[in-house]
A protein has these predicted regions:
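Membrane-proximal basic amphipathic "stem/tether" segments
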Residues: 1-42
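A short alpha-helix capping/helix-coil boundary motif
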Residues: 9, 41-46, 69, 94-95
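Ser/Thr- (and often Asn-) enriched beta-sheet segments in non-cytosolic proteins
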Residues: 30-34, 83, 141-143
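Glycine-rich adenosyl-binding loop in Rossmann-like folds that engage adenosine-containing cofactors
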Residues: 36-64, 122, 126, 131-165
Length: 165
């Protein structure tokens, strides 16, 4: 219901703005949200998490494309590189019966949220292996930085700021 109301043009900006202000005041911006039957630990102040919470069909065309390609090519493995909160991993685990998913997330905060969601979704967690590091074509250590927006570090949109640390 909230996702339908939130799509109305006048409310599309107003609802998130009001919710952010209220949640900052009461300090309850994090928690479990049921996203089409998947319990995800999300933070309403994080822009990607907020999109997932408010708009039921977050990145639906992209996910449908991936699912159709996995089925068409009869793939057994899916690599979710830069998995963030695990949304893609969970959606694919839910739709593809015999898939093995390897999810990689170097950001400690995003990894934490994904880990908590895995614990709540035992029916899907046996398909997903989560690792707390990034992937590259080189064996190297890199320093990453999250983008800061409105005083809040976003878990999506991190960038490498220093090579060979």
């Amino acid at each position: 219901m909230l996702s339908k109301i939130a799509k109305l043009p006048i409310l599309k900006r107003l609802i998130p703005s009001l919710a952010i202000r209220i949640l900052k005041i009461i300090g309850k911006n994090r928690g479990y949200y049921s996203i089409r039957g998947i319990d995800m630990y999300l933070d309403f102040l994080d822009p990607i998490d907020r999109e997932i919470i408010l708009y039921d069909e977050f990145e639906k065309p992209e996910i449908e494309f991936l699912i159709s390609e996995i089925k068409r090519k009869k793939l057994n493995y899916f690599l979710d590189i830069g998995a963030n909160c695990g949304y893609y991993s969970f959606k694919i685990a839910e739709k593809i019966p015999n898939i093995n998913i390897f999810s990689f997330e170097p950001n400690p905060e995003a990894y934490f949220k994904f880990s908590k969601s895995l614990l709540k979704n035992s029916r899907l967690s046996n398909k997903i292996k989560l690792e707390n590091f990034g992937l590259s074509n080189e064996n190297n250590k890199l320093k990453m930085q999250s983008m800061i927006k409105f005083g809040y570090a976003q878990t999506g949109g991190s960038t490498v700021i220093k090579n060979n640390i």
